[in-house]
Amino acid sequence: PQAIRALGRGLVDLCVITTPARLESTMRRTLLMPFQEILIAGRDFEFLQGRRWALKELQQYPLICLGSETMTYAFYNQFYLSNNLVLQPDTEAATTDQVVPLVKSGLGLGYVPQNFAKDALAAGDVFTIQLKEEIPTRHVVLVQDGGRVPNAAAREFARMLNSSVTQQNAP
């Protein structure tokens, strides 16, 4: 929400954010890349390994989530509501990169993009909790305000991002 507000006020020429996102009518978005989030737990919760869990079954365990002012929180709030549950985190992290260390410390279960957890997963510090419910895919998006002309640096940066995405998606 902060990046979108800054774009709407003309404080920035573009922003790179994750979905879901509520955009103003003049803003346009370009999908840059999809990503998948996973639910992870630390060694204190090893007893949760080895089977698929329903979200409802996991509500008894502490949950670490981003703050309620973030779109990630809104995403998980909607995910829980769509499964007839209420999102009730026990700990709110300020940034996504804080979730893995909090999970490793045994403070609870946490949702993170898969690539954020890869090192901790490889080291055996955390593991993926298999869910019965499917977490929807999210996207990294470039957002620009169609009502404003971006400066040269912003245009070049957007061109580079789009070019990089095109090359990654080439056969």
Where are the regions a protein language model picked out?
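Central regulatory/effector-binding core of bacterial HTH transcription factors
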Residues: 1-24, 93
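A late-sequence structural motif
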Residues: 127-170
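Secondary-structure junction motif
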Residues: 47-48, 62-83, 150-154, 158, ...
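Hydrophobic residues within well-ordered alpha-helices
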Residues: 7-8, 58, 101-107, 142
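Short beta-strand-to-loop elements that line the ligand-binding cleft
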Residues: 18, 86-95, 130
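Flexible hinge/capping segments at coil-to-helix
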Residues: 26-64
